[in-house]
Amino acid sequence: MEVKDILKTVDHTLLATTATWPEIQTILDDAMAYETASACIPASYVKKAAEYVSGKLAICTVIGFPNGYSTTAAKVFECQDAIQNGADEIDMVINLTDVKNGDFDTVEEEIRQIKAKCQDHILKVIVETCQLTKEELIELCGVVTRSGADFIKTSTGFSTAGATFEDVEVMAKYVGEGVKIKAAGGISSLEDAKTFIALGASRLGTSRIIKIVKNEATKPDSY
């Protein structure tokens, strides 16, 4: 797999709580230059970013982030607001308290409501795999499939761990046809990226891959 093919799967991400507009601009410029799938940025920057890229790049943002326990109504509003401001893709965090209470029906209904507001915009569902048992992850693969979401996503990048090969393997085995996989958090090498893609991920959430590609390009033997 060539580097350009990896870059096409990347949601080039900056979600730091202290992110400044010049830093967001750099993310947007790099994402456009390297033709990544999208740039994933805080919701407060979506309107300005959408105007800045002027249709040349998909803008992704997050809702219910990073803990997921805001109410469904709050997440629905966040979704509507983000789309009105120019977001093309929404990454939502599920309410893990519902999961731990065994209330998967509520999780599914919340995703359905948000997908209804997304309409043709892509919806990715963050399940925070590092907080799940294998059984919970398998159940959530079914929940996300039935809800009509476009992607199941491993991680926020703000919890105890990010994506693992094992979790992506489970997702690939149990998620339904038509639902794609996004691996996010801790993807720090091109080899890791290739492995995640080989295991079934079609999107990668990372801030590091472009930095790695830039460093490789500056080496004397690079071309």
UniProtKB/Swiss-Prot annotation:
CDD domains (UniProt xref): DeoC (cd00959)
EC number in record: 4.1.2.4
One cellular component term from this protein's GO annotations in UniProt: cytoplasm
Domain of life, per lineage: Bacteria
Keywords for this protein: Cytoplasm, Lyase, Schiff base
Pfam families noted in UniProt: DeoC (PF01791)
Any one Gene Ontology molecular-function term assigned to this protein's record: deoxyribose-phosphate aldolase activity
Keyword Lyase: yes
GO biological process terms on file: 2-deoxyribose 1-phosphate catabolic process; carbohydrate catabolic process; deoxyribonucleotide catabolic process
Function as written in the Swiss-Prot or TrEMBL entry: Catalyzes a reversible aldol reaction between acetaldehyde and D-glyceraldehyde 3-phosphate to generate 2-deoxy-D-ribose 5-phosphate.
Name under which the protein is recorded: Deoxyribose-phosphate aldolase
Source organism of the structure: Streptococcus pyogenes serotype M6 (strain ATCC BAA-946 / MGAS10394)
